[in-house]
Amino acid sequence: MKTLVSLIRSENFEQEVIAEKRPVLVLCMPRDEEFPKQVEVIEVIARKYSTELKVGLLQEDFIEAFKKNYSVVGTPTFLILVEGKERGRMLGLADQEMLTDLISHV
């Protein structure tokens, strides 16, 4: 199955996040033992909200720069960005219900 989750890198951040008209849910997380589970959750969210929300995952070598730019102090952090501006944030492991709640407030 084709993924609906975009890989966000420094080279495509402008196109994938800033220029995107829809809100973008970004997962900022290292590739640890919890990573596969969180990717499954954002895949479900990406399918569920495919027309109204873009979902992105940070490339590993872009995480530190992103954390600095968006004042992310812990991971995993889920951010909702609209034209690059933060509109929502959640720190910690998330399930589908928690992310749905975060999205509903944007």
Regions found by a protein language model. Give the residues of each.
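Short, glycine/charged-enriched secondary-structure capping and boundary segments
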Residues: 39-42, 70-73, 93-95
